[in-house]
From Swiss-Prot:
Annotated keywords: Cell cycle, Cell division, Chaperone, Cytoplasm, Isomerase, Rotamase
This protein's encoding gene: tig
Pfam assignment, any one: Trigger_N
Gene Ontology BP annotations: 'de novo' cotranslational protein folding; cell division; chaperone-mediated protein folding; protein transport; protein unfolding
Residues of the PPIase FKBP-type domain: 164-249
Lineage top rank: taxon: Bacteria
Gene Ontology CC terms, in alphabetical order: cytoplasm
Domain writeup: Consists of 3 domains; the N-terminus binds the ribosome, the middle domain has PPIase activity, while the C-terminus has intrinsic chaperone activity on its own.
Protein name: Trigger factor
Organism field: Limosilactobacillus reuteri (strain DSM 20016) (Lactobacillus reuteri)
Recorded GO MF terms: peptidyl-prolyl cis-trans isomerase activity; protein folding chaperone; ribosome binding
């Protein structure tokens, strides 16, 4: 086969010209004839039994060309792609240039291909320094959060509601005198100051007592998920049934044992909490360094225009992964769109906004894998399978069936590229930054 690839100037697309040899064409025509004659009736012959010569006299061999092409084109195109070593990212647009009897057929394919990446600096780059210090105040705040979680709610009598109290209410909302879906409830428990209701709603209940009726006037935010309510003024008729206040436990050894069965004293709980906070800060710092360093590596690289097909694929993949995550939490796509007051197109636009950056990042990381000759060993692949099996509670054989060796190798190599970029980065404070 003869194939030629011509890339458009500074673009991730071009024209692939290729031929289909006569032997391959004839085999395709033979197969097309066998299938076609089953469908036609010629006087003097049983259906499906017309001889080839008679068929050619009546219909012409050229009538089989399109069916023959459909049979031989996929393999011919794939061979041309392999011969020219290009990486298509979408279905090609095929054009027939020559289809003559007894001659190779000549075709062209307009193809979007993987963009070329010219790496810039990606090692030893400066990134903002990360503070991983865990202070006593951090530990105190964490313990206070645990206290709040262990608090008991006790009935508050003859005292008005304050921030932090929980009120049990009935409410009914209306806009322009008309009630709306989801705007009413009975015996609803609401913590004042939690920010779980529309801005201003909770504040207007502070200072009121049990058994009071309160008119609450609010304005829905402009970006409110229910588009029919966004930016509109609303009136809520509220009945306060009960007011409850938090009763916090003492910060002592008994409290420590209640929140963590593995400790016996408050001192042990503080030490364990500090270690947990340190691990969290270290992980956050690592992620921040990775993001900053990789973003710089992407900015330093020269990347050709990204084909729309790659952006669309990324957007659809991200959206499906997100909806699958919702499904695991018991929220179907239909339920999600109903709850959020959005449509599938809205979610797609949300993920499309960052598609270009995600695709560029993947392209640069793959280029770094090649540039640094990164690879995945059999031992690393085996460990990856073992780790995934433990993470998802699966048998290792099930992981092997779900994920191909190539997929596992790709993930390992990409992680190595991330580590290479991040581990070589230099943390600098604002007053120490250079031009790097």
């Amino acid at each position: 086969m003869s194939a030629k690839w011509e890339r458009d100037s500074d673009a991730s697309k071009g024209t692939l010209t290729f031929e289909i040899d006569v032997d391959t064409i004839n085999k395709g025509i033979d197969e097309a004839f066998v299938e076609t004659r089953k469908k036609i009736t010629v006087p003097g012959f049983r259906k499906g039994r017309v001889p080839r010569q008679i068929f050619n006299q009546m219909y012409g061999e050229e009538s089989l060309y399109q069916d023959a092409l459909n049979k031989v084109l996929p393999d011919a195109y794939n061979e041309a792609v392999k011969e020219t070593n290009i990486q298509p990212v979408d279905q090609p647009k095929i054009d027939i240039k020559s289809m003559e009897k007894g001659q190779p057929w000549v075709l062209t394919a307009e193809v979007d291909v993987m963009p070329e990446v010219k790496l810039g600096e990606y090692k030893g780059m400066e990134v903002p320094a990360q503070d991983t210090t865990v202070t006593d105040a951090d530990v105190d705040d964490a313990l206070e959060t645990k206290r709040q979680q262990q608090a008991e709610l006790v009935l508050k009598e003859d005292k008005p509601a304050e921030k932090g109290d929980t009120v049990v209410i009935d409410y009914k909302g209306s806009v322009d005198g008309e009630e709306f879906d989801g705007g009413s409830a009975e015996n609803y428990s609401l913590e004042l100051g939690s920010g779980s209701f529309i801005p201003g709603f909770e504040d207007q209940l502070i200072g009121h007592n049990a058994d009071e009726d309160v008119d609450v006037n609010v304005t829905f935010p402009e970006d409110y998920h229910a588009k029919n309510l966004a930016g509109k003024d609303a009136l809520f008729k509220v009945k306060i049934h009960e007011i409850k206040e938090k009763q916090l436990p003492e910060l002592d050894d008994d409290f420590a044992k209640d929140v963590d069965e593995d400790v016996d004293t408050l001192a042990e709980l503080k030490e364990k909490t500090k270690k947990q906070l340190q691990e969290e800060k270290d992980n956050q710092a690592k992620a921040a360094i990775e993001d900053a360093a990789i973003n710089k590596a992407v900015a330093n690289a020269e990347i050709q225009d990204i084909p729309q097909a790659m952006l669309d694929d990324d957007t659809n993949r991200q959206m499906q992964q997100y909806l699958a995550g919702m499904q695991q939490q018991g929220i179907s796509p239909q339920m999600y769109f109903q709850i959020t007051g959005t449509k599938e197109e809205d979610l797609k636009k949300q993920f499309a906004n960052d598609a270009a950056q995600r695709v560029k990042t993947n392209l640069v990381l793959e280029a770094i894998v090649d540039d640094a000759n990164l690879d995945a060993t059999d031992e690393e692949i085996a460990k990856e399978i073992s780790d995934l099996a433990k993470q998802y509670g699966m048998e290792e054989d099930a992981v092997k069936k779900a994920l191909s060796k190539d997929m596992l190798m790709h993930d390992i190599k990409i992680r190595k590229a991330v580590d290479l970029v991040a581990d070589s980065a230099k943390q600098v404070k604002d007053d120490e930054k250079s031009d790097k």
